[in-house]
């Protein structure tokens, strides 16, 4: 058994174990929720299907999606500080979701659609501006779009007339899994799978970039086409998760770091490991909020930032050699 297989197996088993603990601990031994035949009553089924399963599923899906997107962006730009929202997709999904939440009373499925459209539109704007000017221009354009959309969000919040709506928007912006719904989760799953397929399709491009874009071109890879497909996939992953959770940072940044430290493999070989680590980190963060009194009043986006920032600084300071060999 290879090191990669051993690590991925261990991470998968850890996810199963912790997910099982979360379900059991939430339910407890509610014997009074069973009928005389020992069958689950409607109340216990509701706790499982309307609360625990959607929340755990959203933690796993969001953590894995952000980690996969982060690994792709760090490989594409050959920069360990690249995040999933570098090209504006995160800000676009956030701005669209905030606008919809404030002005329209719509089901979460339509909020999801708006977030995906916002992520894709902002990414396409950045891409069209900088596609002929190289990665530096692409990053700067993404930064400009992120700042513009961030200002638009701040302007909307500062002019909000409803205190209740303003409070809800602030809660959403801090990131949480409390809005998890099974139907929305199932709708977002195909979008995530399409994004993963885009990145799988361009995995060879990602590996060849470690030797430079010119090398990728000489090996029969179309850099511009592959760049667009891979970054489009990242935008789909980001757009499918942010409307459901709000802003959750650092998962897409530190999960690929952990994967590289543990495996030291090619970027395309780190996708699965990064996904498992990202899912595990977000699930543990959610459990900490639910069961540790110290974190009970902290939103998950705040907690991931509080933990992720020191972890990132530690990793950057302790690594004495280049992350990409």
Placement of each model-derived feature along the sequence:
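Alpha-helical transmembrane segments in inner-membrane proteins
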Residues: 1-325
């Amino acid at each position: 058994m290879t090191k990669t297989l051993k690590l991925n197996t261990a991470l998968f088993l850890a996810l199963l174990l912790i997910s099982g603990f979360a379900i059991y601990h939430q339910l407890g031994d509610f014997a009074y929720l069973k009928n005389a035949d020992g069958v689950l009553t409607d109340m216990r089924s509701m706790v499982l299907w309307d609360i625990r399963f959607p929340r755990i599923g959203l933690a796993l899906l969001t953590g894995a999606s952000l980690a996969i997107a982060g690994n792709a962006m760090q490989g594409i730009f050959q920069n360990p500080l690249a995040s999933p929202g570098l090209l504006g997709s995160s800000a676009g999904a956030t701005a669209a979701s905030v606008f919809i939440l404030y002005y329209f009373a719509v089901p979460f499925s339509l909020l999801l659609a708006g977030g995906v459209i916002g992520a894709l539109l902002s990414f396409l704007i950045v891409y069209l501006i900088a596609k002929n000017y190289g990665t530096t221009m692409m990053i700067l354009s993404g930064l400009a779009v992120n700042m513009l959309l961030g200002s638009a969000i701040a302007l909307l919040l500062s002019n909000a007339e409803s205190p209740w709506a303003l409070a809800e928007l602030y809660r959403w912006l801090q990131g949480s899994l409390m809005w998890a719904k099974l139907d929305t989760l199932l709708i977002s799953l195909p979008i995530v799978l399409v994004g993963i397929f885009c990145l799988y399709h361009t995995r060879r491009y990602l590996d060849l970039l470690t030797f430079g874009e010119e090398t990728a071109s000489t090996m029969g890879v179309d850099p511009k086409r592959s760049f667009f497909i891979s970054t489009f996939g990242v935008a789909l992953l980001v757009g499918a998760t942010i409307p459901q959770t709000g802003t959750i940072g650092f998962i897409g940044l530190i999960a690929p770091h952990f994967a590289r430290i543990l495996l030291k493999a090619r970027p395309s070989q780190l996708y699965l490991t990064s996904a498992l680590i990202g899912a595990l980190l977000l699930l543990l963060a959610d459990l900490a909020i639910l069961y540790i009194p110290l974190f009970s009043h902290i939103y998950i986006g705040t907690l991931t930032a509080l933990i992720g920032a020191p972890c990132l600084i530690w990793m950057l300071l302790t690594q004495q050699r280049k992350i990409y060999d």
